[in-house]
Amino acid sequence: MNPVALRRISPLILVLALVAGACSDGEAPDAATGSLLPADPYELPEFDPASFDALLSELKGTPVLVNVWASWCGPCEQEAPHLAAAHAEYGDRVQFLGVDILDERESARRFMHDYGWTYPSVYDLPGAIRDDLGLLGQPVTLFYDASGGLVTTWTGVLNEDVLRENLEMISS
């Protein structure tokens, strides 16, 4: 492209970039750490399968529990207190991460607050992360070892014993 044409379209490119930035939800990775993991557990940044995979890659070196849930899900409510208690016990050794699907953000935040969740969740309105993982329904909990390998998947309500057994397995 010649310099004259470039000078003519430069203002247009700038305007388009500003408009695109203004239309975003403003929920970029944490600028202070450069991490995709939200520093505020109630932030609920929007993720898709690609950003979720990038986050899992970023977390390699730490065991990870991923729980797929929704605020309107009865079985999710049943296991929520167990997850909060397990996080209090294992949170220094295992990164807990929720994936809120097919939900409204404010309902999800209220659910997290009501059950005392202090670990981050990401927001996936269409449920694309769950679908990309080949999972059906919710709750579903995935346990990853420190090398990033999927150790086991639990579909349905986690009881305390199953939760503790799997957390011990990935954190030892």
Predicted regions and their residues:
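Bacterial signal peptide processing site
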Residues: 23-27, 74
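C-terminal motif of bacterial Sec signal peptides marking the signal peptidase cleavage site
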Residues: 18-22
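Hydrophobic beta-strand anchors of alpha/beta hydrolase catalytic cores
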Residues: 65-66, 96, 141
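A short beta-strand-turn-helix
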Residues: 41-64
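Thiol/disulfide oxidoreductase modules built on the thioredoxin-like
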Residues: 110-118, 125-171
